[in-house]
From Swiss-Prot:
Name of this protein: Guanine nucleotide exchange factor SopE
Family affiliation: Belongs to the GEF (guanine exchange factor) SopE family.
Any Pfam family hit: SopE_GEF
Cited Gene3D superfamilies: SopE-like, GEF domain (1.10.4120.10)
Keywords associated with the record: GTPase activation, Guanine-nucleotide releasing factor, Secreted, Virulence
Note: Encoded within a prophage region, which is only present in very few Salmonella isolates.
Main localization of the protein described in the UniProt heading: secreted
GO cellular component terms, semicolon-separated: extracellular region
Source organism (scientific name): Salmonella enterica VII
GO biological process: actin cytoskeleton organization
Domain of life the protein comes from: Bacteria
Outcome following mutation: residue 63 to T: In strain: SARC16 / s3014
Length: 240
């Protein structure tokens, strides 16, 4: 039987360093204070950031609202400009002067149509006013009929009153306004805008056709308008 002998030298008990209880308590307190300080600092920082964010959002919202209002106004102005440019391009595509230079009959018909439109516009405006005042319009119609006949417009005489055969609206206005209305319908909902675009169409048409009257005996649209306006004023001024 083998005898086992244990030597005490092989087993050494190492001394374990221990921290006093009071020192551990102090460390815990310091750590808690540090954590609390960090927490308070974080809360304060979060609050400041939140206030800044809200302030920035309010400023941004106000600026955005102001920008949108300005953009809306700019967009309206821009759209009016675009519509007018489209109408001008449409008129250029019609090439009234180019066609008139190639076709004398077309040039003659264009002049007659323009002057007849001037006649109709002045007649309607003055007759409406005279009728509203209970004035007989027959003498006025007779006199402006004679003016139209003297201007070289073809027509017919009925009940001693000459009426141009082409009397009516300017034939070039409708194509311009209609084409713009089809392309930009949202711009023609307002009656004021409709009237504005119609006036613009008449203006650019008169500018376009003016050279057609340079070498003919017929008065220009502006001259014919003044002739009819003077006749109308004579009757209007005599109204009570």
């Amino acid at each position: 039987m083998t005898k086992i002998t244990l030597s005490l030298q092989n087993f050494r008990i190492q001394k374990q360093e221990t921290t006093p209880l009071k020192e551990k308590s102090t460390e815990k307190t310091s750590l808690a204070k540090a954590i609390l300080a960090v927490k308070n600092h974080f809360n304060k920082l979060s609050s400041n950031l939140s206030e800044r964010f809200i302030s920035h959002k309010n400023t941004e919202s106000s600026a955005t609202h102001s920008h949108r209002g300005s953009a809306s106004a700019d967009r309206a102005v821009l759209t009016n400009k675009v519509v007018k440019e489209f109408m001008l391009q449409t008129l250029n595509d019609m090439d009234i002067r180019g066609n008139a230079s190639k076709d004398p009959a077309y040039a003659s018909q264009t002049r007659e149509a323009i002057l007849s439109a001037v006649y109709s516009k002045n007649k309607d405006q003055c007759c409406k006013l005279l009728i509203s005042k209970g004035i007989n319009i027959a003498p006025f119609l007779k006199e402006i009929g004679e003016a139209a006949q003297n201007a070289g417009l073809p027509g017919a005489t009925k009940n001693d009153v000459f009426t141009p055969s082409g009397a009516g609206a300017n034939p070039f206005i409708t194509p311009l306004v209609s084409s713009a209305n089809c392309k930009y319908p949202h711009m023609f909902i307002n009656q004021h805008q409709q009237a504005s675009f119609k006036i613009y169409a008449e203006k650019i048409i008169m500018t376009e056709v003016a050279p057609l009257f340079n070498e003919c005996v017929m008065p220009t649209p502006q001259q014919f308008h003044l002739i009819l306006e003077n006749i109308a004023n004579k009757y209007i001024q005599n109204t009570p």
